[in-house]
Amino acid sequence: MDNKIILDQTYFYPTSGGQLHDTGFIAGKRVVDVFKQGNVIIHVLSGKHEFPEGEEVECEIDLERRLQLAKHHTSTHIINAAARKVLGNHINQAGAKKDIDKATIDLTHYQSITDEEIEQIEKEANKIVKESIQVQSNFVPRTEAEQTFGMNIYQGGAVPGKLLRIVNIPSVDVEACGGTHLKNTSEAGEIKILKATKISDGIVRLYFTA
């Protein structure tokens, strides 16, 4: 554990939900990885440290990286909603990965997505971006969230816990999600869908940037 550190509280986001971790510094030492083990968040440093237990440390997050990951995460929600509008209500997220350079979203769909449909989804997604909609996030008891928003809040799989963080883009998309997000859809800039690939029966993967 001499290159790993556990804090009593942290702003660093661990790799989770298909989103990569934050990087930055703890007491001037570079943080190269952050992951969750059970209920504990572990920060991996680039070298050994000698912090005694109980020492107070200053943390600094790489905000440029955080913003880019947030762009791709919010854009995942936007594209999911846009695809549902273009292709039909059977569309759900089956998985996603948010990286720095690009991101992917896996959608439930019974056939390959055509170039024309990709263009329509991209157009609809950028329409949502240009509408400059505030992205809301609140913690809501599970039962209340399910009764208010329905079971479609579970995109990409069930979320554990009695209290859910609900990310709501009003009139666009509502999901239970623990990831980092933009404050407004306009911050996503331009969404560009690079390609679509059928990865298995009933699952199509979209590659995109924002």
Predicted feature residues:
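A glycine- and charged-residue-rich anion-binding loop/surface
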Residues: M1-A210
